[in-house]
Every structure is written in structure tokens, then in C-alpha cells.
Amino acid sequence: MEFVKYQGLGNDFILIDCVKIKIDGLNALGKKLCDRHFGIGADGLIAVFPSASADYKIRIINSDGTEPEMCGNGIRCAMRFVFDYIKPQRKLTFETLAGPIKTELLAENLVKVDMGAPKLTAAQIPLNISDSDGRAVDIPVKLEGGKIKGTGVSMGNPHFVIFVEDIKKTDVAKTGKEVENNTAFPQKTNVEFVQVITPSRLCMKVWERGVGITLACGTGACASLVAGVLNNKTERLALVELDGGQLTVEWPDDGASVFMTGPATEVFSGVFKE
């Protein structure tokens, strides 16, 4: 089976072309291929299919075999993969479990993505806790050692954004895992830890649902900016700094789409012997 590996800010993905060939058992295959010791090694597998409602359809499989609704870094890599190996078209719409996602290749490795409008009610995220208007802005979640406050946002997948004073002193693994699996989140959640450097510059670390700590998360960066605006901590256009690099994120108005711009780079290609 032929594959190409891409990375977006160190968030790495195995891309396969299912336009030409049929592959069964994608969830099990994704878990196998993503294994960094016995497989190719990646945070996720992305398969590109034909679509009746968009240019292409993608399915994303996490390294644990689960299937998320959406992945911001992954969608940029999918755009670059299609341009490089299937059809050299600079504007593409992808069918995803989170709905249609529009992408544009701006430069050689720079992709802009219309991530759609954020969903902000607790029922949409989903989250079992809400404030008086049905949202989940700066709400407490009970943990073993007490409570932690955060803001719930869905970017097609659930996020809980926690603002911290010093991100270097934050135990991302311990707190992230506990929040991800908290009963307040019926579908579990991604967890972002965000330090506001200035209103237009954020520093973020992420615990991804079904993966763990990764170098970057595109939907998480978008959710972090939205949460920053909702908590009056940030401007609507900001640079989000992650362990793997930087993303530019913009939320022009309430109800508008969130736009994310960042890199997608090919790492290598090969053939996996099953």
C-alpha cells in the first residue's frame, strides 16, 4: 500500500489515496500504521475518498483507532496531499464528519482553512455543564484534586480551553488526561492550556482526545482564540504559538467562520507491506 507522510507543525499524518483503491478496516489499519514502533508512526491516518457533495471526502483515524470529527492540522495536510498527488487545485472543499471544510493553498506549504463557525452551547459541544445562557464560558469542572475552570467550544470536535498564568508550570499530561475522560464530557474532549502573552499572541499546549500530548492542534488553536474572545482576553486575530510552530487564527465576528492559516509539509513517501 502506497502512502505519503505529512506534518503540520509536527502533528504528523499518514495520507492514503482511496480515490483509486478500496481499503477496508480503516480504524484497525490506522492504529496499526500509526504505531511508532511496529508501523510507520504518526498521530493519525487520513484517507481521501471521492465525494458526492464536495471535491473529496476524508476520514481521519487517531493513533488509538478512534475516528474524530475533524482535525485542523490534518485538513491542511490533506489539502497539500491532494494538490501534490491527486489534482493540482488550489481551492478544495472536503467532506468531513464535522461538515464541509473549505481550504486554499496560499503558497508552497501554506494552507488557509475556513474552519466554520464555532458551536458554543453546552449541548452542541457536548458538555453536561452550562452557564445561565446555555453556554460553557469559564465554568468549573470537578476533578479529583478539586475544580478547574475552562471554556467549552466545538470546532466540529469538542474542546475545553483552560487559561493558565504560566504554561511551563502546567502538568498537561496529568490534567489533560483527567479532563478528557471527565464525565462532564459525554464524547470526551480535547484539552487546551493557554497562556495569554498579549491580546494578539497566545501560547498553547494541547492534550488531544484519543492521542495525548501532541506538538500542535489546529482545531485547538481555533477553539483557544474563540475562548479568548468570549472571556475578553484576546483580540479576534492572533498568533497562536504551539510546541510545533505557529498558526494564525482569526474569528472576525460572532457567528462567523474561524479562519486558520498554517504550514503543511511532506516528510516522506513509501510502500507499507501489510
From Swiss-Prot:
SUPFAM superfamilies: Diaminopimelate epimerase-like. The record marks H159, E208 as: Could be important to modulate the pK values of the two catalytic cysteine residues. This is Diaminopimelate epimerase. The lineage of its organism: Bacteria, Pseudomonadati, Elusimicrobiota, Elusimicrobia, Elusimicrobiales. Its EC number is 5.1.1.7. Coiled coil: none annotated. The active site is at C71 (proton donor), C217 (proton acceptor). It comes from Elusimicrobium minutum (strain Pei191). The keyword Isomerase applies.
